[in-house]
Amino acid sequence: MDIEAEPSLRSIVNHESLKWIFVGGKGGVGKTTTSSSISIQLALHNPNKKYLLISTDPAHNLSDAFNQKFGKDARQVEGLPNLSCMEIDPDSTLENLQKNNESTFGSAGGNDPLKSMMGDITGSIPGIDEAFSFMEVLKHIGETKENQIKYDTVIFDTAPTGHTLRFLQLPSTLEKLLGKVNELSGRFGPMLNNLLGSQGGQSIDFASKIKEIQVQVTEVNKQFQDPELTTFVCVCISEFLSLYETERLIQELMSYNMDVNSIVINQLLFSDDSECRRCNARWRMQKKYLDQMDELYEDYHLVKMPLLAMEVRGLENLKKFSKYLIEPYNSETDGHVVFDLEEQ
């Protein structure tokens, strides 16, 4: 690119059509703070739109970040009416599915072949927990009875990099899986319906149900590869391992044809004239990797965020911090923010 990319996420906040925003990176680099900050800026700049921030990280830090309890159902952020949050628990989602299977298939004791078959399926597919978490997400962003979309944009606070990549494979994985199940249901669906009926279960049209899910997943897969609808924001710190992980993540995202052109670099010291020798040494180390990133990602939006004296917790503190995603931080004029946050 001939024009240097602005060192902010303003293009994301002002984007009119984005429906999916993923935020991910190595563990411990500030993904939750960044995803929360992006969500807040979106909500503040676009008050007529509705946003949903979802944690797919088993650690679930959204409740801690906002100082408000969130769970598996979307809940509005107190003080920000057009932003809601939810925390998806993959293990819990899978357990609920298995319980639903029991109620649907009935119970014929420990040797029930249908229960055994479902157990084998749910236990043998890699990433099955993320798969059903993803289906849970689709339920929450669907249309209401009045045919109005519940949320304009969904922001994902993802698990550490490996889990993120597995989550992003889900649309194509589910598409292949559902195609196979659809094939089997055509051969065995009537037999299963009869068997379920004889066990007291409800008759189910397997083929139509699978087709319904398959259409939905195929559509989402297309949206993930459309830069007008989906983008990924990488989060890192200025250290070797984090830089290496970020490059690996970007290459993987490109292989999925997913748009990625923004990197948030957290925990920067911005100082080499302090009396703190340790701080100066660390800044010199950070500066070395920052220079590498400036060269390697010259056409990316590189957003450089300061290391603060306190944790960024609570809506008001997140608002203060998040504005530097839009207005680039200047250590000479904005240095006070490092100590300005209120203790939570």
Curated annotation (Swiss-Prot):
<feature type="binding site">
    <location>
        <position position="239"/>
    </location>
    <ligand>
        <name>ATP</name>
    </ligand>
</feature>
<feature type="active site">
    <location>
        <position position="57"/>
    </location>
</feature>
<feature type="binding site">
    <location>
        <position position="279"/>
    </location>
    <ligand>
        <name>Zn(2+)</name>
    </ligand>
</feature>
<dbReference type="GO" id="GO:0071816">
    <property type="term" value="P:tail-anchored membrane protein insertion into ER membrane"/>
</dbReference>
<dbReference type="GO" id="GO:0005794">
    <property type="term" value="C:Golgi apparatus"/>
</dbReference>
<dbReference type="GO" id="GO:0043529">
    <property type="term" value="C:GET complex"/>
</dbReference>
<dbReference type="InterPro" id="IPR025723">
    <property type="entry name" value="Anion-transp_ATPase-like_dom"/>
</dbReference>
<dbReference type="GO" id="GO:0016887">
    <property type="term" value="F:ATP hydrolysis activity"/>
</dbReference>
<dbReference type="GO" id="GO:0046872">
    <property type="term" value="F:metal ion binding"/>
</dbReference>
<keyword id="KW-0256">Endoplasmic reticulum</keyword>
<keyword id="KW-0813">Transport</keyword>
<keyword id="KW-0067">ATP-binding</keyword>
<dbReference type="InterPro" id="IPR027542">
    <property type="entry name" value="ATPase_ArsA/GET3_euk"/>
</dbReference>
<feature type="binding site">
    <location>
        <position position="266"/>
    </location>
    <ligand>
        <name>ATP</name>
    </ligand>
</feature>
<keyword id="KW-0333">Golgi apparatus</keyword>
<comment type="similarity">
    <text>Belongs to the arsA ATPase family.</text>
</comment>
<comment type="function">
    <text>ATPase required for the post-translational delivery of tail-anchored (TA) proteins to the endoplasmic reticulum. Recognizes and selectively binds the transmembrane domain of TA proteins in the cytosol. This complex then targets to the endoplasmic reticulum by membrane-bound receptors GET1 and GET2, where the tail-anchored protein is released for insertion. This process is regulated by ATP binding and hydrolysis. ATP binding drives the homodimer towards the closed dimer state, facilitating recognition of newly synthesized TA membrane proteins. ATP hydrolysis is required for insertion.</text>
</comment>
<feature type="binding site">
    <location>
        <position position="276"/>
    </location>
    <ligand>
        <name>Zn(2+)</name>
    </ligand>
</feature>
<dbReference type="Pfam" id="PF02374">
    <property type="entry name" value="ArsA_ATPase"/>
</dbReference>
<keyword id="KW-0963">Cytoplasm</keyword>
<comment type="subunit">
    <text>Homodimer. Component of the Golgi to ER traffic (GET) complex, which is composed of GET1, GET2 and GET3. Within the complex, GET1 and GET2 form a heterotetramer which is stabilized by phosphatidylinositol binding and which binds to the GET3 homodimer. Interacts with the chloride channel protein GEF1.</text>
</comment>
<keyword id="KW-0479">Metal-binding</keyword>
<dbReference type="InterPro" id="IPR027417">
    <property type="entry name" value="P-loop_NTPase"/>
</dbReference>
<dbReference type="InterPro" id="IPR016300">
    <property type="entry name" value="ATPase_ArsA/GET3"/>
</dbReference>
<keyword id="KW-0862">Zinc</keyword>
<protein>
    <recommendedName>
        <fullName>ATPase GET3</fullName>
        <ecNumber>3.6.-.-</ecNumber>
    </recommendedName>
</protein>
<feature type="binding site">
    <location>
        <begin position="26"/>
        <end position="33"/>
    </location>
    <ligand>
        <name>ATP</name>
    </ligand>
</feature>
<keyword id="KW-0547">Nucleotide-binding</keyword>
<dbReference type="GO" id="GO:0005524">
    <property type="term" value="F:ATP binding"/>
</dbReference>
<keyword id="KW-0378">Hydrolase</keyword>
